[in-house]
Amino acid sequence: MSFVRVCSVGDVAAGGVLAVDIDGPNGVGIAVVRDGDDWYAIDDECSHAAVPLSEGDVSGCEIECWMHGSRFDLRTGKPTGPPATEPVPIYPTKVDGEDVLVDLTTTLND
């Protein structure tokens, strides 16, 4: 695994989401979500409408797309509400001190 720093713990409020664009060969746009002490990194593009998930609402372990209301489980990337039917990639995430780290070379839901 190859973790990279994506933000500081203080950058994301509890129950909040932060859009992060990562440059480089594995560069992607991700949504970093904080649910209490749990952290998640999910691809920042709805599999239904191709709009940023980071602009949607977070409730528990789900993020809702602002456009059509598709919901995705932050732990699995699977859609939990229509109209989306395809999952979105999720990435290993950990906290080291005040740094939030994500491994973009591995997806947890292949």
What are these regions (language model features)?
Residues 1-60, 74, 90-110:
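N-terminal pre-ligand scaffold of iron-sulfur
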Residues 60-66, 79-88:
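Short cysteine/histidine-rich metal-coordination sites, predominantly Zn2+-binding motifs
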Residues 71:
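Short helix-to-coil "ATP-lid" hinge immediately C-terminal to the conserved N-box Asn in the Bergerat
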Residues 46, 65-68:
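Short cysteine clusters
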